[in-house]
C-alpha cells in the first residue's frame, strides 16, 4: 500500500484513536458508549465488555505502533513503569464480568501466578518489552527470562496457552534468541535476555544471520 494516498489518509486518521479510549482519571483504556461517555461501572479486573478475552490490565498496553505516545499518556517514564510493575505484583484475581463464568484464558492467567500478566493470550505478550522504551531495559530482561523459564517447559503444563497464528511459539523462539518485534512488520527489535551465547538464523535467501 506504499504510495496509496487513500489508505495513507485512512490510517493517519486511525493510528492515534487509542488516545480517545484512555481515561487519565483511572489510568486505563476503557470502553465508551454510543454517546461518547465512559461506560460505567468500571473495574479494571473485570473481563469482557469492551475487551475480548481480557481486561483493562491487559489491553491498556496494546499500542504496538506508538509506544512513546502511550508513555506520554501516563505522564512520565516513571509513572509508566510503576503501572507496569503493578501488573506483576497484583494478585491473579479473576472477575469473569460479561463472560458469566471462567474461560480457559482466565484459568491460564491464574495458574501462571504472575499477577495480572496473562501470557496465555496475545494482547499483553509484548508488555514486558515496553520497559525498554521507558529506560528500564533490565526489567524487560528480568521478566522475559521469568516467563521463558516459568511458563514454558517439557511437561503437560509447559505450554501456557493457545497457539493462535503461531504467537505462543514465536514469542518463545524470539525471546530465547534475545530479540522481539513489539510492532510486527517493522524492522525494529527490542533486545531481551537470550538463552544462547550464539545462534544462527538461516534466512529465506540462504544468508545467515548470526
Where are these regions (language model features)?
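Active-site core of glycosidic bond-cleaving carbohydrate-active enzymes
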Residues: 1-195, 199-208
